[in-house]
Regions:
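Substrate-binding/active-site clefts of carbohydrate-active enzymes
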Residues: 1-136
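Conserved alpha/beta catalytic core and glycan-binding cleft of carbohydrate-active enzymes
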Residues: 102-104, 119-217
Length: 217
């Protein structure tokens, strides 16, 4: 459903041509709307015939080697953000979509998976000990910080949104305050919570303490 990316510099022809996508964005701008791209830099397709997994004859030009190469839950490949080639490739990708298609920003997919060595799997993020315990991928955090800096330099009013489950402190703080520079955090747990509550819990059984915990978690 679009999250195992094979070509990072091309929109899928299933939905139209590049010119049609550009025209769609221009039309939206004409109505005063911002167009935010859902950008996937958290992983890539494992299929070597169409993706980057064996681009230079090895499995690790863009990705980790060994145990960290494959994502344990997504059946995909994990970028090695510590490599200059990867950093340049992904930063250039951000700039490409801004310059060539005039997108107004990005919703970064799977940020939790990027910033933790465990990908956030099986973690209960309930305090600072959960965020600062050597389980963080410093290279990924560096990449995301540079990406935010680049995006806002290329397009001053661009918007960046992090899909992030853990509530990492500083995620949406400015660079000058030591943050990663995202404008917003998309807290996926809150929508899921409300959907479940509205569908499954009777009004008279709503618990204020439970709701407060979820909203401030």
């Amino acid at each position: 459903f679009g999250y195992h990316v094979s070509n990072f510099y091309a929109a899928s022809s299933r939905f139209g041509t590049p010119e049609e996508l550009k025209r769609l964005i221009d039309e939206a701008h004409g109505y005063g709307m911002y167009v935010i791209m859902d950008i996937v830099h958290s992983h890539a397709v494992k299929n070597e015939l169409e993706g980057l997994g064996n681009f230079d004859g090895t499995g690790y030009q863009y990705f980790h080697d060994g145990a960290r190469r494959e994502h344990p839950a997504w059946d995909s490949l994990c970028f090695n953000y510590g490599k200059n080639e990867v950093m340049h490739f992904l930063l250039s990708n951000c700039k490409f979509w801004l310059d060539e298609y005039d997108f107004d920003g990005f919703r970064f997919d799977g940020v939790t998976s990027m910033i933790y060595l465990s990908h956030g799997l099986g973690e209960d993020f309930n305090g600072y000990d959960s965020y600062y315990n050597l389980n963080q991928d410093g290279d990924a955090i560096c990449y995301l910080t540079l990406a935010n800096k680049l995006i806002h330099e290329v397009k001053k009013h661009a918007i960046t949104i992090a899909e992030e489950m853990s509530g990492m402190p500083g995620l949406a703080c400015p660079f000058k305050d030591g943050g990663m520079g995202f404008d917003y955090r998309l807290a996926m747990g809150i929508p899921d919570f409300w959907i479940k509550y509205i569908k499954e819990v009777r009004d008279e059984d709503w618990r204020a303490g439970h709701i407060l915990y979820e909203m401030t978690n």
